[in-house]
C-alpha cells in the first residue's frame, strides 16, 4: 500500500511503500538507520540485516544522501521518535542515486547555504519553517473567511504609491512610469467601499538598502481594509487575528515547533487582548531606560522596539505616532492634530514591528491637503481621492508582514529563512 510519512499512523502493523529521499543515514554493524523524508515529514527506516535480503542491506549501507527511492516496510509505533513511528524496512528500490550532494551533515556557512538555497530547503529546519509558514497562511484564510471578509487581489504594477516613490522599483509600462507595488492598501480601500470587509495576500517590493535581519526586498503581506470600522475596532481585529494564527500553529505544527526547538510556553501566552501604549508613553519609557538618542518626533529603531517589547510577554501596540512620521492617508486624532490614529504592533523577543495599521482619512478636503503636504499632487492619486466624493465613511486597515511573523513564531534568527527564495540587497539568485 502506497502512503506518505504523515499518514503512517493509519497503518500501524501494515506493510506500506513510501517514495522518499535519504536525508541522512548511519549504520551499526548489522543494522542500518535511514532518515527518510518525503515532503510531508521525516521518519526513520530501520534495516536489520537478518530480516532482509543481502542486496537490500547492502543498498541501505551504501545509499547516498538525497538519493531517491521507494521504501517498503512495516509501520511500528516508537515513542522515541518525534513522529511516534518508525519503519521496519523490508525492501529498497533506488529511483535515482545522488552523488556529491553539497550540503552534508557538517556545519556550513550562511553564504554557502544561501548559494544553495534550492537545496537547503530540503533540510529539517527549513522544512519545518516552510510548514509553519504554510499553516499561518492557511489560518489567515480561515480567520478572514470566518469573519466575513472577501479576498481581493490588488495589482502588482501600479502608477501610484501609498507611501511615496522613494523606495519603489520603477519600470516602464509602455510609455508610462510604473512601480512594483509596496502595498495594495489604496486599492483595498476602494474594494472595501464596494465589499465592506476585504483582505489581500500577496508580494510587495521595497527598494530599501537595508541589511538587517528584519528586512527583505521582496516579502508577502496580508492587508485587510474595513468600511465603517474605526481605530479601536481595528486594533481588536489585529489582536484577534494574531492570536488566532499563533494558536493555530501551536495546535497543528507541534512536530515542526519541536524540530526548531521553539519555546512554546512563550507562544501559549499570545491571546487577545494585547497591551497598548501611546508614542508619548513609549518615548518617556525609553528615556527612563537611559536611551538618550531619542526625542519626541523621532522614529523608533530596532533597539528601541526591543526595549519596549521586553516589558511585555505579548505583542504590544504603540499608538498615536506623530503625524510627521506617518504616510499621508492616516486620520488625525480628534483631540490632537500632531498625532494620528495609527498603531504599530511590536512582537516579543526582539522581532520588531509585525503590523502597521491606522484609521484612514475619509474627508476629501483633508486628504487633498495631506497629498499636497507630501508633494503627491498628481493625476495618479485622483482616483484614490475620488473615493471620498461618493458616500465616504470611516474606514480602517492594516498590513501584516508574513516573513517577520513567521520569524517570530518560529524563533528564527533572520527573515531570510522564512521565505523559500529570499531577495536581499546583495542576492537575486537562486
Curated annotation (Swiss-Prot):
Cited CDD domains: AsnRS_cyto_like_N, AsxRS_core
EC top class, as a word: ligase
InterPro entries listed in its UniProt record: Aa-tRNA-synt_II, aa-tRNA-synth_II, aa-tRNA-synth_II/BPL/LPL, Asn-tRNA-ligase, Asp/Asn-tRNA-synth_IIb, NA-bd_OB-fold, NA-bd_OB_tRNA
Gene3D superfamilies referenced in this protein's UniProt entry, alphabetically: Bira Bifunctional Protein, Domain 2 (3.30.930.10), Nucleic acid-binding proteins (2.40.50.140)
Record keyword Ligase present? yes
State where the protein is found: Cytoplasm
Instruction: From the UniProt record, list the reaction(s) this protein catalyses.
Output: tRNA(Asn) + L-asparagine + ATP = L-asparaginyl-tRNA(Asn) + AMP + diphosphate + H(+)
**What are the GO BP annotations of this UniProt entry?**
asparaginyl-tRNA aminoacylation
- Which cysteines link up through disulfide bonds? none
One GO cellular component this record assigns the protein to is: cytoplasm
Q: Which PROSITE patterns does this entry report, sorted A to Z?
A: AA_TRNA_LIGASE_II (PS50862)
Q: Signal peptide span per the entry?
A: none
Q: Which family does it belong to?
A: Belongs to the class-II aminoacyl-tRNA synthetase family.
Q: Which NCBIfam families match?
A: asnS (TIGR00457), PRK03932.1 (NF003037), PRK05159.1 (NF003483)
How is the subunit organization of this protein annotated in UniProt? Homodimer.
Q: Return the protein name.
A: Asparagine--tRNA ligase
Q: Which organism is it from?
A: Bacillus licheniformis (strain ATCC 14580 / DSM 13 / JCM 2505 / CCUG 7422 / NBRC 12200 / NCIMB 9375 / NCTC 10341 / NRRL NRS-1264 / Gibson 46)
Amino acid at each position: 500500500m502506497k502512503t506518505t510519512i504523515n499518514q503512517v499512523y493509519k497503518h500501524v502493523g501494515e506493510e506500506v511503500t513510501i517514495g522518499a529521499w535519504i536525508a541522512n543515514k548511519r549504520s551499526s554493524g548489522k543494522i542500518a538507520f535511514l532518515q527518510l523524508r518525503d515532503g510531508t515529514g521525516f521518519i526513520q527506516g530501520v534495516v536489520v540485516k537478518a530480516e532482509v535480503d543481502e542486496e537490500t542491506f547492502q543498498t541501505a549501507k551504501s545509499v547516498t544522501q538525497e538519493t531517491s527511492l521507494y521504501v517498503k516496510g512495516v509501520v511500528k509505533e516508537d515513542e522515541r521518535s518525534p513522529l511516534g513511528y518508525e519503519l521496519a524496512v523490508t525492501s529498497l528500490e533506488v529511483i535515482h542515486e545522488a552523488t556529491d550532494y553539497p550540503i552534508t551533515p557538517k556545519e556550513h556557512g550562511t553564504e554557502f547555504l544561501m548559494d544553495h538555497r534550492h537545496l537547503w530547503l530540503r533540510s529539517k529546519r527549513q522544512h519545518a519553517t516552510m510548514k509553519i509558514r504554510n499553516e499561518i497562511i492557511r489560518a489567515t484564510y480561515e480567520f478572514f473567511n470566518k469573519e466575513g471578509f472577501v479576498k481581493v487581489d490588488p495589482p502588482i504594477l501600479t502608477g501610484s504609491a501609498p507611501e511615496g516613490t522613494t523606495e519603489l522599483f520603477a519600470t516602464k509600462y509602455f510609455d508610462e512610469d510604473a512601480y512594483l507595488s509596496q502595498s495594495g492598501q489604496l486599492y483595498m480601500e476602494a474594494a472595501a467601499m464596494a465589499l465592506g470587509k476585504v483582505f489581500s495576500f500577496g508580494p510587495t517590493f521595497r527598494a530599501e538598502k537595508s541589511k538587517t535581519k528584519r528586512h527583505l526586498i521582496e516579502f508577502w503581506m496580508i492587508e485587510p481594509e474595513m468600511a465603517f470600522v474605526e481605530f479601536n475596532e481595528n486594533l481588536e481585529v489585529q489582536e484577534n487575528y494574531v492570536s488566532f494564527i499563533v494558536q493555530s500553529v501551536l495546535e497543528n505544527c507541534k512536530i515542526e515547533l519541536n524540530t526548531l526547538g521553539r519555546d512554546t510556553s512563550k507562544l501559549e501566552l499570545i491571546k487577545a487582548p494585547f497591551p497598548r501604549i501611546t508614542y508619548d508613553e513609549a518615548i518617556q519609557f525609553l528615556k527612563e531606560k537611559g536611551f538618550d538618542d531619542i526625542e519626541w518626533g523621532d522614529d523608533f529603531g530596532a533597539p528601541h522596539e526591543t526595549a519596549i517589547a521586553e516589558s511585555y510577554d505579548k505583542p504590544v501596540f504603540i499608538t498615536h505616532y506623530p503625524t510627521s512620521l506617518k504616510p499621508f492617508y492616516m486620520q488625525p486624532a480628534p483631540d490632537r492634530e500632531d498625532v494620528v490614529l495609527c498603531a504599530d504592533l511590536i512582537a516579543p523577543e526582539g522581532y520588531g514591528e509585525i503590523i502597521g495599521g491606522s484609521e484612514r482619512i475619509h474627508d476629501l478636503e483633508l486628504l487633498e491637503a495631506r497629498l499636497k503636504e507630501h508633494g503627491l499632487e498628481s493625476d495618479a492619486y485622483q482616483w484614490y481621492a475620488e473615493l471620498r466624493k461618493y458616500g465616504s465613511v470611516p474606514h480602517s486597515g492594516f498590513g501584516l508582514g508574513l516573513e517577520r511573523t513567521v520569524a517570530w513564531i518560529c524563533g528564527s534568527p533572520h527573515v531570510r529563512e522564512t521565505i523559500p527564495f529570499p531577495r536581499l540587497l546583495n542576492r537575486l539568485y537562486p
